[in-house]
């Protein structure tokens, strides 16, 4: 079976069309942290078969796999097809092609939740204190609650 590919531009459109999509990065965890698409979920190829079902329980779900353009995503697509997933595509050229098309690559892990927290802080002006202020509050036995 030939692996379907999607261009970076097509993937960008898929991510914004409102339909269900699972964007899975099949590189190993360290590689994922070095740079990935914003809403990609890490699913290392080494854990593919043991971890796919909790992430994508419906075998007809639309799945796009990304990698470093080194063929790992194609191997993962073939394996997913073999175990019954029917709508699997690969990002043509991997993350490098995504970046070359002018789209952002994000470093680190849990980026969407960190981004959300920063947006909430910016928009709603959530209160924050410095380490020095916290030490002074503790020294004065002030009653406080810290939410991190």
Task: Explain the meaning of each model-derived region.
Residues 1-22, 26-145:
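Rhodanese-like catalytic fold shared by cysteine-dependent sulfurtransferases
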